[in-house]
């Protein structure tokens, strides 16, 4: 008696179904990863802003010990232990713009940060899409 030999492998229909399922999974997963990259940039910018505010606070505290209670007139690399101003992850800039008023939360600039020397306020400039006013 002759035995029929079983064919192994996938049919074209099975392969197409797998590709369709993978496509559907990719379509639903990609937007979630895009949102994560935006959140990561925001978190990195907030971390840099924390470093900027700490540097200003330390400089102010040092001026108090000498009896000249004043905020630094500008933010320079000398205020940081590694002699580098942190990069604003939203617009990839390390420069600091002096200003007399708080910019809007979505204000953009070539500078990464804004600084008001009269009050010691420091903030992050946006990339135009992220509102930084609540930071």
PLM regions with names:
Residues 16-32:
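Alpha-helical hydrophobic helix detector
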Residues 1-10:
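N-terminal leader/signal peptides at the extreme start of proteins
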Residues 11, 28, 43:
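Conserved Walker
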Residues 122-135:
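Short, low-complexity, Pro/Ser/Thr/Gly-rich segments in the mature regions of secreted, periplasmic
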Residues 38-66:
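Membrane-proximal N-terminal amphipathic helix
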Residues 61-120:
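Extracellular/periplasmic head regions of type IV pilus-like filament subunits
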Residues 11-14, 64:
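Hydrophobic, well-ordered secondary-structure segments
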